[in-house]
């Protein structure tokens, strides 16, 4: 068969041309970097009973077959925390650091009693190499063609990489295939990472695919969509206030795929829970409906059962600040559009207090 020919680094990380890379650097160099990134020892996290079980080939055990399988992550057993510290080293300028649970301890007055500083264990790669890795990882998520696109969340610069491996030391599935581990690691902001989101799925049940980009990446994207605003992670700098988005048709789409489509468009999502709702099922109803023109950041309520449209009561937000009114409406399952002075107080609302409206409805508040 005809091969791919020469490929760039972005294509290499997307389609995993790692066996050739392993062959080129050789067994000793491969092991040296494997060790330098912390995969042969505990991370040193300040939690009790960190496991010391790690499975890997040492340099003198890496024959051609072992090197080939190790090069794409098939022949070793490591912990999720080891993976997180290694990814951090790859994108933070090249430094392997010891993870900590507590950043600092303060007294009741907010005075810092003890602060846990960064414990740099060693520099693994150069700053320039780390910068190149960040760019490649951002390309994987943001270019719209690789599997990393399923972790994309509009408004954020995200870098990421998927990983799929077989559990060779476990009993096989009933179909005779090996059990799989599907994972995805993301960092953001990609130009100056502050957080890592790592999701590892242990042989997902009832999955129609083994690809991590279709299994773990959407979960990462959904976590980012909730965590990034809460932590105040810097956005990509583009002002989207006043932007109008068209709601896509999600009926018949699997729940996980629906979430991805909304993340890409800059819309939030909420599963309208009932006794029979299932996150693994397909969407049967949505509100706002497909084709609706809504503000960037609007929440779309999705249903995975036959119940069409839960209702909620509109709270009285008159006299409240715009921010507090927005919070009250959100807590009631409603979207909010602010007209007038966004720093003022609510003078009027488009739906009367106490009215019963469909969950996900847009309430316009006029502030002054």
Q: What does each of the following model-derived ranges do?
A:
Residues 4, 10, 14-198:
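Beta-lactam-recognizing serine transpeptidase/beta-lactamase-like catalytic domain environment
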Residues 55, 116, 152-155, 169, ...:
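Ligand-recognition elements built from short beta-strands and adjacent flexible loops
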């Amino acid at each position: 068969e005809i091969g791919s020919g020469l490929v760039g680094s972005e294509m290499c990380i997307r389609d995993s041309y790692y066996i050739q890379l392993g062959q080129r650097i050789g067994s000793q160099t491969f092991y040296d970097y494997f060790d330098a990134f912390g995969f042969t020892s505990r991370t040193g996290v300040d939690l009790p009973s960190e496991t010391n079980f790690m499975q890997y080939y040492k340099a003198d055990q890496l024959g051609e077959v072992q090197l080939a399988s190790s090069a794409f992550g098939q022949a070793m057993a490591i912990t999720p925390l080891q993976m997180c510290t290694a990814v951090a080293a790859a994108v933070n300028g090249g430094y392997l650091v010891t993870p900590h649970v507590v950043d600092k301890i303060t007294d009741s007055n907010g005075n810092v009693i003890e602060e846990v500083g960064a414990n740099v264990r060693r520099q693994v790669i150069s700053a320039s190499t780390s910068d190149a890795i960040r760019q490649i990882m951002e390309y994987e998520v943001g270019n719209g063609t690789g599997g990393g696109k399923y972790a994309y969340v509009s408004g954020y610069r995200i870098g990421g990489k998927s990983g799929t491996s077989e559990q060779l030391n476990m009993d096989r599935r009933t179909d005779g295939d090996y059990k799989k581990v599907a994972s995805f690691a993301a960092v953001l902001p990609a130009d100056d990472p502050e957080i890592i989101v790592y999701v590892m799925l242990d042989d997902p049940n009832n999955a129609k695919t083994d690809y991590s980009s279709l299994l773990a990446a959407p979960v990462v994207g959904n976590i980012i969509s909730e965590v990034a605003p809460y932590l105040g992670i810097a956005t990509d700098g583009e002002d989207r206030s006043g932007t109008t988005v068209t709601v896509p048709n999600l009926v018949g789409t699997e729940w996980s795929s629906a979430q991805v489509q909304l993340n890409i468009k800059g819309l939030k999502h909420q599963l309208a829970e009932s006794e029979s709702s299932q996150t693994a099922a397909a969407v049967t109803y949505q509100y706002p409906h497909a084709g609706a023109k809504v503000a960037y950041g609007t929440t779309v309520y999705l249903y995975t059962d036959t119940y069409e449209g839960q209702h909620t009561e509109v709270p009285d937000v008159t006299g409240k600040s715009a921010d507090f009114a927005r919070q009250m409406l959100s807590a009631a399952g409603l979207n909010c559009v602010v007209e007038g002075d966004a720093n003022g107080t609510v003078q009027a609302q488009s739906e009367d207090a106490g009215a019963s409206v469909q969950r996900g409805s847009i309430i316009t508040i006029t502030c002054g």
